[in-house]
Structure formats: C-alpha cells, structure tokens
Amino acid sequence: MRFLLVAVVAMMALVSSSTAAVAETSNDINTMNNNQEFARSLRNTEERSIAAILAEAGEEDRAAWRINYRAWYKAKLTPTQVKTVLGVSQAEMNNVAKQLQRLYLGYYSFYTAMEKKKEEKKRLATP
C-alpha cells in the first residue's frame, strides 16, 4: 500500500513538472502578439481630466501643496520662477485653464437649471 502511494506521488510529480515545462514554451509569434496587445492597451488609455484629478485629490494632497506654496514663498520665488522650476509652458497652462473653465461653466449651467426647476416646483405648488 505504501509503495503504491509513493509510486502515485512520484507519477504526479513527473506529470506536473512536464506540463509546467510545456506551459513555459512559447514561440515568437505569441510573444509578438502579446507585445502588440500591450502596446494597443497603452494607446487606448485616456489621459485623466482635471475634474478627475480634482475629485481624487484629498485634503492631505491639498495640505502638501500648501506646504510647497509656503516653501516657495519663503524662498522668495516669483510665480514665473516657479513656472520655470516646474517646467510648465504657457500653452500647457492655457490648456489647463480652458479645462477648468469648461468644468466651472458646466457646473454653473447645471446649478442654474436645478435652481430654475426648484423655483418652478415652488411656483406650481403654491396656489
């Protein structure tokens, strides 16, 4: 009985190691396809918008930025010097400003529409 158990365990070890060796072999075509799929996934990722970044920014992040502001102010850096240190171009700043303006205008139109609905409900509710 013990001999049979040892034989079964040895056979299982032999079979499992042979399938592991087979699983590791791959040809160049599979590797190329995997690389193409990986490259495609990188191209399909969208850049995060300013709204998404602001939504994820917590109080800790904002506190860290305050610390940077204070350090820059104590170092007597002007805003143009900070822009140079950060490596931000004017075109990038304009793009960010446009995205923030779109975000604000979108919320403003949503807010005014909701307020108009509220006023309309209030007007219809009163006889």
From Swiss-Prot:
Transmembrane segments: none annotated. It is found in: Secreted; Host nucleus, Host nucleolus; Host nucleus. A motif (RxLR-dEER) lies at residues 40-62. Changing L103D: Disrupts homooligomerization, prevents association with UBK, impairs nucleolar localization and accumulates in the nucleoplasm with cytoplasmic background. The keyword Membrane does not apply. GO terms for cellular component: extracellular region; host cell nucleolus. The WY-domain is involved in the homodimerization leading to a novel trans WY-domain configuration in which the Trp and Tyr residues are derived from separate monomers. Effector that suppresses flg22-induced post-translational MAP kinase activation in potato and tomato, but not in Arabidopsis. The perception of highly conserved pathogen- or microbe-associated molecular patterns (PAMPs/MAMPs), such as flg22, triggers converging signaling pathways recruiting MAP kinase cascades and inducing transcriptional re-programming, yielding a generic antimicrobial response. Does not suppress programmed cell death triggered by the P.infestans elicitin infestin-1 (INF1), or by co-expression of tomato Cf4 with Cladosporium fulvum Avr4. This is RxLR effector protein SFI3.
